[in-house]
Amino acid sequence: MPIRHCIVHLIDKKPDGTPAVLHARDSELAESAAIENLLADLNDSYNAKQGKAWGFFHAESGAYPFSGWLKEYFDGSQDFTSFSRVAIKHLQTLMEASNLSTGGHVLFAHYQQGMTEYLAIALLHHSEGVAVNAELDVTPSRHLDLGQLHLAARINLSEWKNNQNSKQYISFIKGKNGKKVSEYFRDFIGCQEGVDGPGETRTLLKAFSDYVEKEDLPEESAREKTQTLVDYATAQTKLGEPVTLEELSSLIDEDRPKAFYDHIRNSDYGLSPEIPADKRTLNQFRRFTGRAEGLSISFEAHLLGEKIEYDEAAGTLIIKGLPTQLIDQLKRR
């Protein structure tokens, strides 16, 4: 993963309402194994985050100047350090206006993954821990806590440059229930939501269910294809990459690689050729779950119709082949 440019600034903002203080770095970080490890860990943490949203830039304006500065950097009108410094000052201003925000170290990284260039921006926080030093004393230790990554965005620079009609070249952490605490960061990027990741994923899964029904697939084949879809989509979310419908179609049916893709296109589901899969929605598709007072049921989707029968009119489930452990417990009751 070649790192083209990387820099870290610090915005010191206390929760007591005092003005935020900016400590801006004057030069880029030198290449090092530590920087490479940091960015790799950041990517892993970011890709694993649930609740991300996808979108595109607002038109450049006084309220949303970030895309203009990014364009100047990308066109060579200003260097990376200058771009990051003017951007971090804008973030400082927005932080001061937000009562919900706290400061921290802000990372800007321009890197390449495969043939694609990205810009990652993340607000990093620290955690206090302990360490053992060379004298074998236990001492306090402060470290970056990427598990507490709540404000971050990633811009697909290649997509932004080459596909002006795209509405999903920016991804950002939206937070649980779209927390307002993240709004100032989204405004800093100047991003508007263009793609509903969970909604697109639900539509994809609906299209797949319709396809299985239309093809009248045997139970074993349907189960295998379901697993193929979930495995591929889950792998793409871990990589931070979208689900490509044509690639998915070829994996679902190697003998007829266009069959599922043609089904989607001919049925007009309104799906884009590439969609950002939502991990939470995929997990729900993998299993059926339900809870009531004193009762919890969870089973894999492919068991429905095989070991589990659902009677909608009666509101009952019939479970065949109970686990031996459960049978033993029932006998001992």
Curated annotation (Swiss-Prot):
Q: Which InterPro entries match?
A: Nucleoid_associated_NdpA
Q: Which GO terms describe its cellular component?
A: bacterial nucleoid; cytoplasm
**Coiled-coil parts of chain:** none
Protein name (record): Nucleoid-associated protein PSPPH_1145
Specify the superkingdom: Bacteria
Which HAMAP family does UniProt cross-reference here? NdpA
What's the source species for this entry? Pseudomonas savastanoi pv. phaseolicola (strain 1448A / Race 6)
**What molecular functions are annotated in GO for this chain?**
double-stranded DNA binding; single-stranded RNA binding
Q: Which family does the entry's similarity section mention?
A: Belongs to the YejK family.
